[in-house]
């Protein structure tokens, strides 16, 4: 310690004690602030802690440096270096009854008096104490003392014997050090290297020197001015820090020629540097007359690539107090905690808080790291907000194989949870499109298959000017209404809407029966009414009222329908026009809107947004002329595209308009899963190549990867390759011929010709078992199997030779002809190999290559070696 500025030290093994050193030694006990408030004389260190003075030691004047004994016992033994070069062992009144009490008061005296600059206890051999002294031309500057050595014999003059304070016994001085190092030079700083108790790093006058006590005549050194405050990183023993003036040098002892990193501080000189004992690669520095401590985080420092490459660091500054800081000390166990002391002995307990790093997992778990602690955010609210998140929904749908049912396409909405009416409409639309495309292809290939997937908008446009209306009688009423004659295109539109089945029959009876079975009484009654069957509508409403979950008010509605009259000025029409606005069910509203509207003016039905789009479109196809229908479909399509409503796929189909609609849907919901499966269902090639479609598909694939759904990702890729052959990836691995370099698998997987069928890597599955034993390109023979000695490509036979367990190689006929058994298999180290089936059989009982004179341990070169049972491996 220089001047009167105090220094501070934490006890190495007593985490609640520290000592302040200046002209005397003061021992403090740290406790929580709540308890310390009850004691007089406590000093507040922070909001949570306070210090109580335990003892003061004033027996060692002229202190220049202090080092706390590193062992557990004795607890409060300190070495004090004095201005005359002596090192005194003292305590703070805690060890008078200890078995080590003879150590207290012991002095270690150099031959020539000069200032002691630094002290360092050996962390491995705790009895060794290194002292660094100023230069003397006739003496060494680094002395290593053994504190357990006996006192000096008779050659010591009696005048050097003194009485210990408070004791009658005499304690003799020790003048013979264990080692003497560094002649004709000053030692400014010392530290032992933890990797070896015999290695000592010393900051001499103009160099850093590493002394090996096993051979003290030699030393390794490097010339530098940064010789002060040498300290070893406790987590990386080859990394050392030292300083000079305003610069900090970071050294790597494995490359000791020059610093690996130089940190430039402020113009003011440094007074202390210290590695954090609880945090990897965190270095704290303090400059003179400053209230700021700078921290350098070298945890993320990359390894230098070239001689001139300096690693990057993360730098930050902390201000523990407002006054100038004289010294600081890291707490030995509490994370990132330090205590600072000012020149007037004001102390502050301070914790350096880490930068918080957030991590949000793909399954919506939120965690953050703060130092050693890892916290997980748990949702305590019961609003099921997590279940409503689209990522959670997509993940659950992926587990249920949503979108992969290509036979009964409509079932995909059930796999999605059967909760979203838009998804239900979408998958029923795609189901009808697939169904009627197949039906049209069977009737007249190439006729209307592509038109079906183009949507009702394109279908309606193809029949403009071809439809006329005619008057039709009501069922149950003496009335006639104009209905458009259904041509082929309008019938197809009604089929896509689900009102009628495929074929020439236009009866909506089956559709009504399905609605009744699902309990959609109001919708079924409305569809029956739109088909001029008021009697069937009343019957359905009565059935709904009498059902278990039915609404009794349906009887009232049925009664109102039964009183229908065609007179424009009747009381019935007036009352229904008023009361329909008070009905909650949209289908009941449109029923009365239809009955009270004028011929051709059906806006009350067509623009009721709560009615399903497919029902409104089907209604329009029955009652609107070509011009009105086209105008209505165009307007409705634009509304669906802007809103991103999946029901609009019925209108747009899987066309560019459909991509625009789906883009709005994805922007609104983020559901790339539905967008991907929908576009793959039947879109033409130009639509599949759209950048937006490819973007949704790739993002969904990335989502499956992020969720670690590897099998689901594979299923999706297979599903995609079936519906979009152009997306099938090229082979990433193939076997090439040693002579011509051409791929063997390319020719083997080609279409069979002239009665010779080749399957990939060998034999076909045909009963003839065609053989491929040569390269299809140059006709050179393929390599031979190391076990059966037959050219590769032939059908695998049972493994030749005896085995320790015949049942292990007794392959069934199915396994003998399995394609995997014929694959080319070889070791990347020795290049020997053979049929996969033979290799698996061999390595069940052996670890060494089957080729004679080859000692390669093929199966133990990678993790696949773990597949071989240890008890079956031959030594």
From Swiss-Prot:
Physiological role: As a component of the GATOR2 complex, functions as an activator of the amino acid-sensing branch of the mTORC1 signaling pathway. The GATOR2 complex indirectly activates mTORC1 through the inhibition of the GATOR1 subcomplex. GATOR2 probably acts as an E3 ubiquitin-protein ligase toward GATOR1. In the presence of abundant amino acids, the GATOR2 complex mediates ubiquitination of the NPRL2 core component of the GATOR1 complex, leading to GATOR1 inactivation. In the absence of amino acids, GATOR2 is inhibited, activating the GATOR1 complex.
Zinc finger (RING-type): 782-863
Phenotype of gene-disrupted mutants: Embryonic lethality around 9 dpc. Conditional deletion in neural stem cells specifically impairs the formation of myelinating oligodendrocytes, thus brain myelination, without effecting the formation of neurons and astrocytes.
Pfam families listed in its UniProt record: MIOS_a-sol, MIOS_WD40, zinc_ribbon_16
Keyword Repeat attributed: yes
GO MF entries: zinc ion binding
Compartment(s) where it occurs, according to its Swiss-Prot or TrEMBL record: Lysosome membrane
Residues the record lists as binding Zn(2+) 4: 830, 832, 849, 854
Phosphoserine modification, residue list: 759, 766
Control of this protein's activity: The GATOR2 complex is negatively regulated by the upstream amino acid sensors CASTOR1 and SESN2, which sequester the GATOR2 complex in absence of amino acids. In the presence of abundant amino acids, GATOR2 is released from CASTOR1 and SESN2 and activated.
Tissue expression notes: Widely expressed. In brain, expressed in neurons and glia (oligodendrocytes and astrocytes), with more abundance in neurons.
Family membership noted in the UniProt record: Belongs to the WD repeat mio family.
GO cellular component annotations of the record: cell junction; cytosol; GATOR2 complex; lysosomal membrane; nucleoplasm
Keyword Lyase: no
Main location: membrane
Keywords from the UniProt entry: Lysosome, Membrane, Metal-binding, Phosphoprotein, Repeat, WD repeat, Zinc, Zinc-finger
Organism the protein comes from: Mus musculus (Mouse)
Subunit annotation: Component of the GATOR2 subcomplex, composed of MIOS, SEC13, SEH1L, WDR24 and WDR59. The GATOR2 complex interacts with CASTOR1 and CASTOR2; the interaction is negatively regulated by arginine. CASTOR1 and CASTOR2 convey leucine availability via direct interaction with MIOS. The GATOR2 complex interacts with SESN1, SESN2 and SESN3; the interaction is negatively regulated by amino acids.
Binding residue positions for Zn(2+) 2: 788, 835, 838
Stored SMART domains: WD40
The protein's name in its UniProt record: GATOR2 complex protein MIOS
Binding residues for Zn(2+) 3: 827, 830, 858
Domain of life: Eukaryota
């Amino acid at each position: 310690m220089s001047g009167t500025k105090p220094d501070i030290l934490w006890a190495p093994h007593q985490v609640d004690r520290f000592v302040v050193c200046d002209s005397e030694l003061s021992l403090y006990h740290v406790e929580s602030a709540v308890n310390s408030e009850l004691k007089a004389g406590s000093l507040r260190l922070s909001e949570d802690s306070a210090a109580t003075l335990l003892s003061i030691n004033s027996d060692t004047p002229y202190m220049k440096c202090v080092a706390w004994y590193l062992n557990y016992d004795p607890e409060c033994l300190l070495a004090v270096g004095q201005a005359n070069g002596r090192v005194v062992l003292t305590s703070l009144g805690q060890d008078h009854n200890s078995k080590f009490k003879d150590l207290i008061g012991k002095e270690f005296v150099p031959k020539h008096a000069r200032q002691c600059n630094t002290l360092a206890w050996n962390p491995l051999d705790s009895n060794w104490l290194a002292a660094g002294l100023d230069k003397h031309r006739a003496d060494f500057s680094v002395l290593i003392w053994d504190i357990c050595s006996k006192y000096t014999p008779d050659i010591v003059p009696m005048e050097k014997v003194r009485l210990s304070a408070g004791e009658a016994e005499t304690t003799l001085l020790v003048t013979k050090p264990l080692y003497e190092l560094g002649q004709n030079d000053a030692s400014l700083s010392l530290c032992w290297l933890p990797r070896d108790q015999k290695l000592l790093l010393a900051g001499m006058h103009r160099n850093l020197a590493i002394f090996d006590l096993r051979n003290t005549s030699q030393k390794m050194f490097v010339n530098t001015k940064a010789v002060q405050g040498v300290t070893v990183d406790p987590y990386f023993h080859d990394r050392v820090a030292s300083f000079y003036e305003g610069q900090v040098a970071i050294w790597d002892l494995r490359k000791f020629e020059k610093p690996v990193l130089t940190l430039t501080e402020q113009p003011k000189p440094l007074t202390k540097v210290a590695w954090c004992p609880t945090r990897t690669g965190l270095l704290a520095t303090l400059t003179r007359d400053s209230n700021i401590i700078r921290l350098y985080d070298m945890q993320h420092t990359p390894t230098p690539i070239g001689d001139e490459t300096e690693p990057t660091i993360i730098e930050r500054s902390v201000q523990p107090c407002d006054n100038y800081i004289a010294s600081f000390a890291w707490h030995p166990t509490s994370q990132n905690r330090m205590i600072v002391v000012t020149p007037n002995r004001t102390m502050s307990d301070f914790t350096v808080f880490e930068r918080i790093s957030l991590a949000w997992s793909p399954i919506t778990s939120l965690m953050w790291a703060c130092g050693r602690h890892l916290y997980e955010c748990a949702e305590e609210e019961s609003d099921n907000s997590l279940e409503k998140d689209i990522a959670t929904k997509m993940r659950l749908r992926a587990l249920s194989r949503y979108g992969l049912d290509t036979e009964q396409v409509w079932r995909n909405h059930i796999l999605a949870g059967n909760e979203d009416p838009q998804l239900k409409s979408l998958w029923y639309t795609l189901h009808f499109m697939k169904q009627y495309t197949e039906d049209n292809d069977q009737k007249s290939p190439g006729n209307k298959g592509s038109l079906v997937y183009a949507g009702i908008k394109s279908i309606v446009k193809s029949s403009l000017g071809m439809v006329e209306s005619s008057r039709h009688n009501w069922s149950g009423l003496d009335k006639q209404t104009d209905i458009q004659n259904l041509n082929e295109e309008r019938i197809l539109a009604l089929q896509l809407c689900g009102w009628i089945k495929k074929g020439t029959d236009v009866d909506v009876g089956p559709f009504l029966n399905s609605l009744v079975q699902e309990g959609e009484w109001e919708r079924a009654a409305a569809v029956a009414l739109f088909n001029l069957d008021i009697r069937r509508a009343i019957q359905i409403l009565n059935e709904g009222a009498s059902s278990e979950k039915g609404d009794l008010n349906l009887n009232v509605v049925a009664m109102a329908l039964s009183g229908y009259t065609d007179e424009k000025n009747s009381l019935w029409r007036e009352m229904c026009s008023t009361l329909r606005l008070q009905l909650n069910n949209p289908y009941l509203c449109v029923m009365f809107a239809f009955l009270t509207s004028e011929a051709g003016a059906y806006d009350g039905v067509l623009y009721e947004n709560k009615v399903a789009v497919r029902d409104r479109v089907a209604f329009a196809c029955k009652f609107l002329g070509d011009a009105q229908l086209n105008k209505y479909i165009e307007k409705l399509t634009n509304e669906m595209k802007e809103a991103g409503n999946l029901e609009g796929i019925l209108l747009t189909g899987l066309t560019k308009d459909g991509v625009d609609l789906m883009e709005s849907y994805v922007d609104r919901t983020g559901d790339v899963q539905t967008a991907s499966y929908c576009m793959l269902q039947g879109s033409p090639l130009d639509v599949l190549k759209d950048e937006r479609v490819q973007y949704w598909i790739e993002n969904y694939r990335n989502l499956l990867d992020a969720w670690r759904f590897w099998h689901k990702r594979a299923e999706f890729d297979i599903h995609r390759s079936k519906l979009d052959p152009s997306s099938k990836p090229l082979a990433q691995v193939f076997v090439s011929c040693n002579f011509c370099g051409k791929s063997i698998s390319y020719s083997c997987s080609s279409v069979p010709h002239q009665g010779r069928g080749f399957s990939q890597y060998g034999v076909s599955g045909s009963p003839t078992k065609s053989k491929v034993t040569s390269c299809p390109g140059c006709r050179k023979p393929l390599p031979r199997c190391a076990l059966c000695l037959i050219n590769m490509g032939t059908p695998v036979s049972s493994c030749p030779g005896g085995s320790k367990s015949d049942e292990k190689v007794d392959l069934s006929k199915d396994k003998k002809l399995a394609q995997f058994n014929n694959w080319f298999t070889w070791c990347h180290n020795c290049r020997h190999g053979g049929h996969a089936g033979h290799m698996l059989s061999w390595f069940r009982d052996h670890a060494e290559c089957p080729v004679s004179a080859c000692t390669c341990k093929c199966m133990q070169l990678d993790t696949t070696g773990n597949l071989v049972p240890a008890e079956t491996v031959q030594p």
